[in-house]
């Protein structure tokens, strides 16, 4: 069967993706819009490749994703206001703040009135690294009931600005979460043994397994 699922990102062709950078009103960012443009688009980024390079190689040149990165959008609220479960509220507020500056129709690649994909970077580190309930765990999910300028905003992925030791987030986490946007499932033990068993998954050999953490740049 085809991998394509309802409202997912196209799996072949040259397409546009939007990356939204979100900051809080009481925090400062370490990395710039240009830094994330390199992470997403620069050929041979950091010696191993960018997000674009990864999906070009994995698709044997059939999927070419050009990412437009917004400037940092500073929210009205403090970090603690949104908390670890505030991703949808953050995204909604940030998109509303810049809706006059960006045309979401550019990122509806198939013209069906739905934004094909939205990749979000939030200031700071992710809960998967800090263990803090104040931080957001990187994930892929869906927004219900948000339409901006006639375009429905549904699927999104969200990742942190920093990975560890104040290093910029690696492409592995971004590629992993975006894999869900293409219709790919997780291939690791998603409940970490709480159901009474453990699943080794596909390990470091698969971006949807442990491969998102391979090396300094994922």
Describe every region a protein language model picked out.
Residues 1-153:
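Zymogen propeptides/activation segments of proteases
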Residues 117-119, 123-218:
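Extracellular hydrolytic enzyme modules, especially secreted metalloproteases
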